[in-house]
């Protein structure tokens, strides 16, 4: 797991609404999302960071070997990069972002357990 992926602080943590990666707001703005940057383009765009991440999430998983992890398969994060992931994330991506994902062939499954998709 790359040290750039690990949250540098326990304050101001946010989770990506698409893949549930957990980082600080500054890390998302500086590096974007390690898994979703090509779709969400958060790097250098604080407004997109606020729209595409949530500060409300439950549980964290530190995933180091996605190919060997049954937890990664259970959480549907087995194809993602090693890092710290939220178990559930409250919130949904904006409709415009969901439409853009769909047009690029990406299926969006909300990680919000309060909302059925």
UniProtKB/Swiss-Prot annotation:
Localization terms from the record: Nucleus
Identify one Gene Ontology CC term for this UniProt entry: DSIF complex
Segments carrying the region annotation (Interaction with SUPT5H) are 1-40
Which molecular function terms from Gene Ontology are attached? RNA polymerase II complex binding; zinc ion binding
Q: Which key words are in the record?
A: Activator, Metal-binding, Nucleus, Repressor, Transcription, Transcription regulation, Zinc, Zinc-finger
Q: Where are the zinc fingers (C4-type)?
A: 16-36
Does this entry carry the keyword Transferase?
A: no
Source organism's superkingdom?
Eukaryota
Repressor listed as a keyword:
yes
Instruction: Return the Pfam families for the record.
Output: Spt4
Q: Which Gene Ontology biological process is one annotated for this entry? A: transcription elongation-coupled chromatin remodeling
Q: Which InterPro entries match?
A: RPABC4/Spt4, Spt4, Spt4/RpoE2_Znf, Spt4_sf
Cite the PANTHER family for this sequence: SUPPRESSOR OF TY 4 (PTHR12882), TRANSCRIPTION ELONGATION FACTOR SPT4 (PTHR12882:SF1)
Q: What is its biological role?
A: May function as a component of the DRB sensitivity-inducing factor complex (DSIF complex), which regulates transcription elongation by RNA polymerase II. Probably enhances transcriptional pausing at sites proximal to the promoter, which may facilitate the assembly of an elongation competent RNA polymerase II complex. Also acts to stimulate transcriptional elongation at low nucleotide concentrations. Regulation of transcriptional elongation by this protein is required for the expression of genes which control neuronal development.
What does the annotation say about its assembly with partners?
Answer: Interacts with SUPT5H to form the DSIF complex. DSIF interacts with RNA polymerase II and with the positive transcription elongation factor b complex (P-TEFb complex), which is composed of CDK9 and cyclin-T.
The family classification in the record reads:
Belongs to the SPT4 family.
In Swiss-Prot or TrEMBL terms, this protein is called: Transcription elongation factor SPT4
Which species is the source of this protein? Danio rerio
